[in-house]
Amino acid sequence: NTKPAGFKLPMYGLIKRIFDKAYSKADQLLSLGRDMEDVLVRKVENVEKIKERQPRFTIIENWADIETIKPQPVPEGKIILEYAGNIGRVQGLDKVMDMLPEEVELHLYGTGAMEEKLKARKQKNVFFHGPYFRSQQNEVLAACDIALVTLQEGMYGLGVPSKTYNILASGRPVLFLGPKNSEIDLLVRENGIGYCDWPKKWDKAELAEMGRRARDLAEKEYSERIILEKFLKVI
């Protein structure tokens, strides 16, 4: 887990072996996605002399707040791509701004270490809205055609952006920029609820249809009740 942070000293290899052995002694290992489970399986397989006893692996995803967050009408006018969260160094928002087509607006909600640097670019189709309260989440998520989710390359299996599931609840598709075959990459591609690379063409009608599929998926697969039932089955 230390590779994405750039740690290469021998002591971190020792720490990794200690943690891998601890994982191997568990009866049950829960993960948030398929990529995370893949990493856990390989960690356990690396530990010697445990072939007679393997932990059970179960995936339990984050849930979508489908009761509080409801689909709202899509804004008229230009296509709006929205990012809500930490405006930090590892989110890659500078690269997003580089790739942003002129006909698409990028709206940023939140604050962070890169905020002032990005503002200084004075890009005409990029707008900064600052932080927001959790009580405003429904309103914020509805203020776009498609929502941006990023995950740093090298973070495969080490994190699943939980914001994704409330985006689905809001009835908005996802533009995911991150490791291939990570959980959100698979989720988006398998269900047709967005893009995992910059689309060649932006179409409001297509985005709206993807958004309807996203909400339907949230209700059928990721409600609080469904996810809590998964926990009950392993307790």
Task: Please annotate each region the language model reported.
Residues 105-110, 115-138:
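Nucleotide-activated donor-binding/catalytic signature segment of Leloir-type glycosyltransferases, i.e.
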